[in-house]
């Protein structure tokens, strides 16, 4: 029987294939009293080691196929496996209660999950709860000798159907066979959606109950552009979906022709399209997709991939490789953004109730705790500056004095290197990431002293709306097109231009096809996004008239009170079909 479902369009693409139901195994067990607690601890250690080996392999595959940024979630999982407090409590429970490892594991991890989930004002801890649940399931499966579903074994064209996909599930998908996936829960900003876009496979999330409606082998049609899903479609519907897929493939082929084209609007106005990267090897994707710059190089992955602080020489080689790989095109390097959801096992930071609003990023760099680490990074960057067009960006800036202090340290290290006879470029732009509302509101003062702004909308929207974008209960508040967000962006861009500086954007909003016309109208100079979004955005921009987009933006800023009103207004100016 044919059934039609509507979900959240999370990743573009159209596919028709057999359903592959990703069923979670039965992990029920009985609590058993034991006398040999040492043997139970040994069983636990073996399961922990097997899980660690498994996750390390999955992480490496994720790095190879998705890049460092997408793979970073597995660092959090590996840290859970190595958490001495939690592992210690599990072993203590085995010894004191004389129960099997399965029972002790569940008791302790359930306690931690409940504790973190109840921290409703702390999205960081709520995310850690999800990590613990995922890791505990893996360890329990090893204790029970049960195999977890392995999407890597899929060897024919399939549509993966699941209640949800964990990061470890998504990292194992082979885009040669998995043409799309559909889940009961999730949204555009969930880990699985982001990974689907990186893999360039269609995804529709949040269908509520597709796992109850689909059997293995059913034919499923998925449109990741519209969010439409059909179970056991008719021949006519299959033909319709295949035609839509061919149209999309044709579009992609047309976009590919724009690889070496300049990014100009229909009336000849140029905008810079840049790409975000996490490692030097991501530069290949930047160039293959025709980006004009690297708009955000997230340097924290250098630290997260090391067993100790990366040395000045190690960092220099990485920065040099990126600058040389870009052949003189601009490279915006963000100084390390450690803290929040990015922890380093070798860097002992104080535990905080809310790390996202705590001691992180530039706050660490300019403190006594992180000063030497910051100076090492700046020296490496300055040495590498002679190999290309370097731009240095400081993250998580709230106060002008924070920028001044960081800039002062940069100037000190520049003078030190010159005194040592080391060549340093004298043409390095220094800017800040605008992700805190306080900095956005004071952009007119910052603009007098910085060389550029890059608006980090992922955090700016969260902080402005007081809503965690990964929390489904409040995800409706994550509104890039809300007039309040558009007004903040407009204020920052105007402040930059008033001082003759440029303003860019490096959050997901920069590559959002609905947001781009509004941002063109506001006058944003640079758009930095995932490399795979560059050509599509260039194609869109070629159809836009800046005068009309300025009119659209002005009306959105002055006439609209809600996101819905902005979207309705945009329909008067843009036909997205």
From Swiss-Prot:
A cellular component annotation (GO) from this entry: cytoplasm
Keywords of the record: Cytoplasm, Kinase, Magnesium, Metal-binding, Phosphotransferase system, Sugar transport, Transferase, Transport
Entry's localization field: Cytoplasm
Gene Ontology molecular function: kinase activity; metal ion binding; phosphoenolpyruvate-protein phosphotransferase activity
Positions contributing to phosphoenolpyruvate binding: 298, 334, 458-459, 469
EC category: transferase
EC number: 2.7.3.9
Amino-acid biosynthesis listed as a keyword: no
UniProt remark on domains: The N-terminal domain contains the HPr binding site, the central domain the pyrophosphate/phosphate carrier histidine, and the C-terminal domain the pyruvate binding site.
Family statement: Belongs to the PEP-utilizing enzyme family.
Function field: General (non sugar-specific) component of the phosphoenolpyruvate-dependent sugar phosphotransferase system (sugar PTS). This major carbohydrate active-transport system catalyzes the phosphorylation of incoming sugar substrates concomitantly with their translocation across the cell membrane. Enzyme I transfers the phosphoryl group from phosphoenolpyruvate (PEP) to the phosphoryl carrier protein (HPr).
Protein name according to UniProt: Phosphoenolpyruvate-protein phosphotransferase
The species this protein was found in: Streptococcus mutans serotype c (strain ATCC 700610 / UA159)
């Amino acid at each position: 029987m044919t059934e039609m479902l509507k979900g959240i369009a999370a990743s573009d693409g159209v596919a028709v294939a057999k359903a592959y139901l990703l069923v979670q195994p039965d992990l029920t067990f009985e609590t058993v009293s034991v006398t040999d607690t040492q043997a139970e601890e040994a069983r636990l250690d073996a399961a922990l080691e097997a899980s660690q080996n498994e996750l390390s392999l999955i992480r490496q595959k994720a790095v190879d196929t998705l890049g460092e940024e997408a793979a970073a979630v597995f660092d959090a999982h590996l840290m859970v496996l190595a958490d001495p407090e939690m592992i210690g409590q599990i072993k203590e429970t085995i010894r004191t209660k004389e129960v099997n490892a399965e029972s002790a594991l569940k008791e302790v991890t359930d306690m931690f999950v409940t504790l973190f989930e109840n921290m409703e004002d702390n999205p960081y801890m709520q995310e850690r709860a999800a990590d613990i649940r995922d890791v505990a399931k893996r360890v329990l499966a090893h204790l029970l000798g049960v195999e977890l579903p392995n999407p890597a074994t899929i060897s024919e064209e399939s549509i993966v159907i699941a209640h949800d996909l964990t990061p470890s599930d998504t990292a194992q998908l082979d885009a040669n066979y998995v043409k799309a996936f559909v889940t009961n829960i999730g949204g555009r900003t969930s880990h699985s959606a982001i990974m689907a876009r990186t893999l360039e496979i269609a995804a529709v999330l949040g269908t509520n109950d597709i796992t109850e409606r689909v059997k293995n082998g059913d034919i499923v049609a998925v449109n990741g552009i519209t969010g439409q899903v059909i179970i056991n479609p008719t021949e006519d519907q299959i033909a319709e979906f295949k035609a839509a897929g061919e149209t999309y493939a044709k579009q992609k082929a047309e976009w590919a022709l724009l690889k070496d084209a300049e990014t100009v609007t229909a009336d000849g106005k140029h905008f810079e399209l840049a790409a975000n990267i996490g490692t030097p090897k991501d530069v290949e994707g930047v160039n293959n997709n025709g980006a004009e710059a690297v708009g955000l190089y997230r340097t924290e992955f250098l630290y997260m991939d090391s067993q100790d602080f990366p040395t000045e020489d190690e960092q220099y080689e990485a920065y040099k490789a990126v600058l040389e790989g870009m052949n003189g095109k601009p490279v915006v390097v963000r100084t390390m953004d450690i803290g929040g959801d990015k922890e380093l096992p070798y860097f002992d930071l104080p535990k905080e109730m809310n790390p996202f609003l705590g001691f992180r990023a530039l706050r660490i760099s300019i403190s006594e705790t992180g000063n030497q680490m910051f100076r090492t990074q700046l020296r490496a960057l300055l040495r590498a500056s002679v190999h290309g067009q370097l731009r240095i960006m400081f993250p998580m800036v709230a106060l002008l004095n924070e920028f001044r202090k960081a800039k002062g340290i940069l100037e000190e290290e520049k003078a030190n290197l010159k005194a040592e006879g080391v060549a340093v470029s004298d043409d390095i732009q220094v800017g800040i990431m605008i992700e805190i509302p306080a900095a956005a509101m004071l952009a007119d003062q910052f603009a007098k002293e910085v060389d550029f702004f890059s608006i980090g909308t992922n955090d700016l929207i969260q902080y402005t709306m007081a809503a965690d974008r990964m929390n489904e209960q409040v995800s409706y508040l994550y509104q890039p097109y809300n007039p309040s967000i558009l007004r903040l962006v407009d204020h920052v861009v105007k402040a930059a231009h008033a001082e003759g500086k440029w303003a860019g954007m490096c959050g997901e909003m920069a590559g959002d096809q609905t947001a781009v016309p509004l941002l063109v109208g506001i006058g944003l100079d640079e758009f930095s996004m995932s490399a795979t979004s560059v050509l599509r955005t260039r194609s869109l921009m070629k159809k836009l008239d800046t005068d009309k987009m300025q009119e659209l933006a002005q009306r959105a800023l002055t006439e609209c009170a809600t996101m819905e009103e902005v979207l309705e207004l945009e329909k008067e100016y843009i036909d997205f079909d």
